[in-house]
């Protein structure tokens, strides 16, 4: 009988095996609406759980500091080539362990401590690594932040230009963690050129949409592009750096290794290669289009039920529910949907009077449940479930009904039906 990795884990460490199995069951039984999460394919899982985890491979393909990298080199080169093809880049580094690591490598390449960076305020939808005072990017560099218009809750490029002209940053950052609208990278390029700044696009959230042409591609306009490889790209958790400037690419490579990292995680890079290959297939185009259709369907249904959305809708995979109109905090809303097996996250909204630990918003996304096969009909039902729960927060009857409807949806769209980690019954 052939033994699987799961068999070995179960026999070696039933406690960990049992907890992994419980997490698998949680993922199966919940509606996953966290905008930054997705479900990788079984092939990606297999690559990450392979013997590649054993191999040290400091350096780049063909230029390693360790022996025995002949097969590692081929795998990493495939990942590089596929990433370049997917995004239309001339250079790709697939080694960053995360999106944050990718951004740090860019900072090391383009900036010196004390230089000024300009990115979106975290409370308006930016990211920690774009100059938040609690992050190293906000400690090593001077920072100025732009936000969205108070009237439209969308980017105001005239305001951004005025701030850039006043502050003269060395690096201008676009790309966000909670912005539901299209980004005009060409306008950002014009602003960067006017003030003599480098332009970085962090497309961690929208990479899958960019790869399929459903969101404008920043590469023709930006000096450097960074992204994560999960979220809408549906790969393993990791980072990626892209550029069309080959000479700049060499400097970025040195900033990844030895600048900010040691040995790359080759089992994760193999998972990235598999995911990039999947994203190059025609089926991924249909998936990405469905992600947007499902997000718009969910947004429309929430609005139909009387809930307010930041910027009045979405162009991509995510939306922000502004709960101030129903006198509720994001923390309370997160708790309410969690109780009926919906996973989301509280989130600040623009000009939020609440603290980041409380917030006035709830962020929702469509990628994960689209991966499970759900379409507009299911996302209409999801919108109704969320509205029923939030608009009837004190009703146990409504809560039980919502939980039942969540279970019915999950049962119709099974997750990883082939996966099971057998856990022995301990005496």
Curated annotation (Swiss-Prot):
Nuclease in keyword set: no
Top-level division of the source organism's lineage: Bacteria
Site for Plays an important role in substrate specificity, residues: 230
Reaction it catalyzes: (6R)-5,10-methylene-5,6,7,8-tetrahydrofolate + glycine + H2O = (6S)-5,6,7,8-tetrahydrofolate + L-serine
CDD domains (alphabetical): SHMT (cd00378)
Compartments where found: Cytoplasm
Keyword field: Amino-acid biosynthesis, Cytoplasm, One-carbon metabolism, Pyridoxal phosphate, Transferase
Keyword Protein biosynthesis (UniProt): no
Entries under InterPro entries matching the protein: PyrdxlP-dep_Trfase, PyrdxlP-dep_Trfase_major, PyrdxlP-dep_Trfase_small, Ser_HO-MeTrfase, Ser_HO-MeTrfase-like, Ser_HO-MeTrfase_PLP_BS, SHMT-like_dom
GO molecular function terms noted in the UniProt entry: glycine hydroxymethyltransferase activity; pyridoxal phosphate binding
Enzyme Commission number, as recorded: 2.1.2.1
Post-translational modification N6-(pyridoxal phosphate)lysine, affected residues: 231
GO cellular component assignments: cytosol
This protein's pathway: One-carbon metabolism; tetrahydrofolate interconversion; Amino-acid biosynthesis; glycine biosynthesis; glycine from L-serine: step 1/1
Subunit field text: Homodimer.
PANTHER family: SERINE HYDROXYMETHYLTRANSFERASE (PTHR11680), SERINE HYDROXYMETHYLTRANSFERASE 1 (PTHR11680:SF35)
Role noted for this protein: Catalyzes the reversible interconversion of serine and glycine with tetrahydrofolate (THF) serving as the one-carbon carrier. This reaction serves as the major source of one-carbon groups required for the biosynthesis of purines, thymidylate, methionine, and other important biomolecules. Also exhibits THF-independent aldolase activity toward beta-hydroxyamino acids, producing glycine and aldehydes, via a retro-aldol mechanism.
UniProt-recorded name of the protein: Serine hydroxymethyltransferase
